[in-house]
């Protein structure tokens, strides 16, 4: 079951836009398997985007390509094996600064059933130049991506 938190009564203006999307789900797969789906580009590209390219180390560039959304460049911010994977991403041709990118953080925790509690936090929408529209788009996108990773793990 996934939980999702975003103030539903927020007025979407540049002054009051929520800064963060947060989603958590319980997956019936061990942390090692979920970690691989998040951090190995070939696996990540299988469920998240059309292709994914990176070297798994802090500071490494990443590149995600989407058939209908183009290229999303980024940089890996944190790699804490089996625990946390974070990257900053934005739009092709724009700098990866606070006005043009957001921070995506995945955390993994083993649960009592041998599965994984997976949490995603994407932050930085309040300072994003197109924050109001981007938080709406990404909120829907993360719903779809959580379904996609669950399906990928169930079948792979």
Predicted regions mapped to residue ranges:
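Hydrophobic-ligand binding "helix-grip"
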Residues: 53-55, 69-115, 123
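Intrinsic-disorder/low-complexity, polar/charged segments enriched in Ser/Thr/Lys/Arg/Asp/Glu/Gln
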Residues: 18-24, 31, 61, 71, ...
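A generic structural micro-feature
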Residues: 15-19, 68, 96-100, 134
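Conserved catalytic core of Hanks-type protein kinase domains
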Residues: 37-38, 79
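Short beta-edge strand/loop motif at the mouth of beta-sheet-based domains
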Residues: 22-23, 42-75
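Short acidic N-proximal helix/loop "leader" segments that mark the beginning
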Residues: 1-22
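A conserved amphipathic terminal alpha-helix motif
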Residues: 2-8, 124-156
């Amino acid at each position: 079951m996934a939980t999702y938190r975003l103030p539903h009564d927020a007025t979407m203006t540049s002054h009051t836009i929520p800064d963060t999307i947060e989603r958590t789900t319980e997956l019936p797969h061990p942390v090692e398997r979920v970690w691989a789906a998040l951090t190995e580009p070939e696996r990540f590209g299988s469920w998240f985007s059309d292709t994914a390219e990176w070297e798994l180390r802090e500071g490494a560039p990443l590149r995600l390509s989407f058939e209908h959304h183009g290229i999303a460049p980024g940089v890996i911010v944190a790699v804490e094996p089996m625990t946390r994977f974070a990257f900053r991403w934005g739009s092709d041709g724009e700098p990866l600064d606070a006005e043009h990118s957001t921070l995506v953080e995945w955390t993994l925790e083993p649960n009592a059933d041998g599965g994984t509690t997976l949490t995603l936090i994407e932050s930085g929408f309040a300072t994003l130049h197109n924050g109001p529209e981007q938080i709406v788009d990404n909120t829907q996108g993360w719903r779809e991506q959580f379904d996609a990773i669950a399906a990928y793990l169930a079948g792979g």
